[in-house]
C-alpha cells in the first residue's frame, strides 16, 4: 500500500488499525467504513488484490456492509478495477445468507468460502488463474 493509502486509512479507521496489510476495519465496522476503506484501496494502484471479508458479530449488520460494498464497487471507475482482483466473502451460514443474496442480485456473487482461511485461499487461486492466462 502507498503512503497516501495509509494516511487516508488513518483518517477512516480506529487508531489501533494495523497500518499495513491486511487492513482490519474491525468487527464494529459500519457500511460506511467498509465503503470508504474499499474506495481508498481501489484508488491505490499498488494494491492488486482486495479481499473484503465480513465475519458475523453482534456489533455490525452484514446486510448493511454488503450494500455499502456493492455501492462502492458500482461507484468505482471501471478503469480503476481493470486487472484487479476484488473478492468478497461473507462468512457464516445463516447470518450471511441475505447479504450473499444481495451480491448475487447485483451480479457480484461472493466467494463460496464460509471460513477466513478458505476465503484467503480463494483470492490466491484467483490471482494464480489470472497470471496463468
Predicted segments with their positions:
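Short glycine-cluster motifs
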Residues: 1-55, 64
